[in-house]
Regions:
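N-terminal active-site segment of His-dependent metallophosphoesterases
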Residues: 1-79
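Extended recognition/assembly regions associated with phosphoester-bond processing machinery
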Residues: 3-22, 41, 54, 161-165, ...
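A general structural motif
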Residues: 23, 55-57, 88-90, 170, ...
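Active-site neighborhood of phospho(di)ester-bond hydrolases with catalytic His/Asp-centered motifs
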Residues: 29-30, 61-64, 92-96, 210-216, ...
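Short, glycine/acidic-enriched loop or turn micro-motifs at the edges of active sites
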Residues: 33-34, 68, 100, 179, ...
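Active-site neighborhood of divalent metal-dependent phosphoester bond hydrolases
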Residues: 56, 69-162, 196, 200-202
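Acidic, His/Gly-enriched loop-helix segments that form or flank divalent-metal centers
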Residues: 124-125, 129, 133-229, 233-239, ...
Length: 298
């Protein structure tokens, strides 16, 4: 009788590590924020890796926030808009809150002062436009918006207007900001996908997939069993991060260049060399799959 009441437990299987399908290589790139100087070498390194990869499906996901804060928003948009011409790669360009703000400004110029509070002024300067000196002058902002619409090429506007909100590959879900806990990933609101922060970051509730995101900056990659954050504050730190996923293996690739000096504006002439190095350095590391919060140099 006792043996029937107290049956021995079956051994508990180790948790299955997240993966992408066999034959697939996925790259995700964090928030660029106008740092074309960091984006170019990272794209070159990713393209070289994909050329050599033994894969039948090659995916690259940019997580949004391409503009603002850094010195060359225009150059970044132009570069990304041209990538779709590269064949044999599945490109996904996600919409960040900064792209939403720029599009909102084009539709409603009265939002200009608010947009410029978090870096929109640098985006406008990259297009050769001056921010109105009197923030409350509606007609001045309307002229700037009209000038920006005139300057943007058809390819650039098409790029901005067709940005995606999310994409899933295997056990991974990619969005700009994260996702709202307790809501299925396929039912997330656009607002949360572009803007959510603390409700996502502070929750211990998991999702159907591991969420790969940007939006919330940190000087190091943030990784645990439910999310991987790869916004390394490129506009200030001079470090732009790429995440590579193949099978169950995850690794990091970072381009490192000049960083913004304390107390300076975002203009390119005010960037300082990082660690005394000139130019841009590409560094690699891997994320330990048994301890996803640890990035291991390699």
């Amino acid at each position: 009788m006792l043996s029937k009441l107290f049956r021995s437990r079956a051994p508990v299987a180790a948790p299955t590590l997240p993966a992408v399908p066999e034959g697939t290589v996925v790259w995700a790139v964090g928030d660029v924020h106008g740092r074309l100087d960091l984006l170019e070498p990272l794209i070159d390194a990713i393209m070289a890796d994909l050329r050599d990869a033994a894969a039948t499906r090659r995916v690259v996901v940019f997580l949004g926030d391409y503009i603002d804060r850094g010195p060359d928003s225009r150059g970044v948009i132009r570069r990304l808009a041209g990538l779709s011409q590269v064949q044999d790669i599945e490109w996904h360009f996600l919409k960040g809150n900064h792209e939403q703000a720029m599009l909102g400004f084009l539709q409603n110029p009265s939002t200009g002062p608010k947009w410029c509070e978090y870096g929109g002024d640098n985006a406008l300067r990259s297009y050769g436009l001056r921010v109105p000196e009197l923030a409350h002058r509606a007609e001045a902002w309307a002229r700037v918006a009209a000038d920006l619409r005139h300057i943007l090429t058809e390819a650039e506007m098409d790029f901005l207007e067709t940005l995606e909100l999310s994409v899933s590959v295997g056990d991974y879900f990619f969005s700009h900001a994260g996702a709202r806990p307790g809501v299925a990933l396929n039912r997330q609101s656009p607002e949360d996908l572009m803007w959510i922060r603390q409700p996502f970051l502070d929750s211990a509730v998991g999702f159907e997939r591991v969420v790969v995101h940007g939006h919330t900056p940190a000087r190091t990659v943030q990784a645990d069993s439910r999310r991987i954050g790869i916004d390394t504050k490129a506009y200030e730190t001079g470090v732009l991060t790429g995440l590579r996923i193949q099978g169950r293996e995850r690794s990091l690739l970072q381009s490192s260049g000049p960083q913004r000096g304390p107390g300076t504006r975002y203009g390119g002439e005010e960037y300082l060399p990082v660690d005394g190095e000139q130019g841009v350095v590409v560094r690699a590391a891997r994320i330990d799959p048994q301890d996803p919060g640890v990035a291991v140099g390699g």
